[in-house]
Amino acid sequence: MNIFCSPGVFRNGQVSSILGLKPNAISNFGFLARVPLQNGRFDRTEVDLRLSDLLIEAKLTESDFQRAPKATVRVYRDFNEVFDSEYLPQTESDYLSYQLIRNVLAAYASGGEFCVLTDARRPELIEDWYAVMKRALG
């Protein structure tokens, strides 16, 4: 994440190009995304970083992507439109990788994109990401 703090990191266009962004993207750390709920309200989830329309979750030191009760996750307006929920990673009572599910829904609601940055020495987190994304519809 430190690279995004460096002044002028987007100036020459190379980093922007790798991320599919226009040059001079502005970093917005701790971005409060608005994820629509079925009742018309919003969940104000914090995403680690927003660059233009790209939301980024950096998982560098935490052990997992958290879990949440199924009832909590099912209240998101676009949940059934975005995910094949039957096959998401889950236990009897909880969906696993809740942060990923919520942030994918945040990107979907804003018409943006979402990516995960993690340490290559944490293959279990990469597997968690793939387990969620292969259940995204469309």
Where are these regions (language model features)?
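Active-site metal-binding core of divalent-cation-utilizing nuclease and nuclease-like domains
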Residues: 24-54, 58-64, 68, 92-93
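Short acidic, gly/pro-rich beta-turn/loop elements at beta-sheet edges
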Residues: 13, 66, 126
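Non-catalytic C-terminal interaction segments of nucleic acid-processing enzymes
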Residues: 108, 115-138
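Accessory terminal regions of nucleic-acid processing enzymes
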Residues: 9, 77, 81, 137-138
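Secondary-structure boundary elements
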Residues: 9-13, 50-58, 107-113
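Generic detector of well-ordered alpha-helical segments enriched in charged/polar residues
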Residues: 4, 16, 80, 84, ...
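Acidic-basic catalytic patches of nuclease active cores, encompassing PD-(D/E)XK
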Residues: 1-34
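Catalytic cores of nucleic-acid endonucleases
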Residues: 60-120
